[in-house]
Amino acid sequence: MNPSRCRILAVGKVRRSWIQDGIELYRKRLPGLEIIEIRDSTPDKEADSIRASLRPNEHVIALMEEGDAVGSIPFARRLDQLGNQRLAFVIGGADGLTNELKGRAHWQLSLSPMTFPHELARLMLIEQLFRAQAILQGSPYHRA
């Protein structure tokens, strides 16, 4: 997994400082990872902004409650199988993603069957990206 080939497209701003601190901690550990903030709006306007931000060659991974729930090791393996593809992780707003965006995704992923604030989902995703990299590199960060 190459962080410089990954982008996170997330609706809304991170307002809680402790979440922002966590995101920055992992961003430093994942040089090249790009986070694009999409302005909060209606689901259709958010979808328009997300579509406009997606690149044609990106493998789209939509984060959604009803997506596939996988553990950290299978997540790392799946990212490894994607090789050098460019990845776009998409986190919707409070109302989630439109059906069109869900259908466009190459993979629908759930971080948990529980519901979390979207800014916390962003922190959880970036930590899992770092963990996936650590797993693939054999780092002691991940202790199963």
UniProtKB/Swiss-Prot annotation:
It comes from the Bacteria. Keywords: Cytoplasm, Methyltransferase, rRNA processing, S-adenosyl-L-methionine, Transferase. S-adenosyl-L-methionine binds at L63, G92, L111, S112, P113, M114, T115, F116. Its main location: cytoplasm. One of its GO terms (cellular component) is cytoplasm. It catalyses: pseudouridine(1915) in 23S rRNA + S-adenosyl-L-methionine = N(3)-methylpseudouridine(1915) in 23S rRNA + S-adenosyl-L-homocysteine + H(+). Its EC number is 2.1.1.177. One of its GO terms (molecular function) is rRNA (pseudouridine-N3-)-methyltransferase activity. It is found in: Cytoplasm. SUPFAM superfamilies: alpha/beta knot. InterPro entries: Alpha/beta_knot_MTases (IPR029028), RlmH-like (IPR003742), tRNA_m1G_MTases_N (IPR029026). The keyword Repressor does not apply. Homodimer. Specifically methylates the pseudouridine at position 1915 (m3Psi1915) in 23S rRNA. Belongs to the RNA methyltransferase RlmH family. This is Ribosomal RNA large subunit methyltransferase H. It comes from Parasynechococcus marenigrum (strain WH8102).
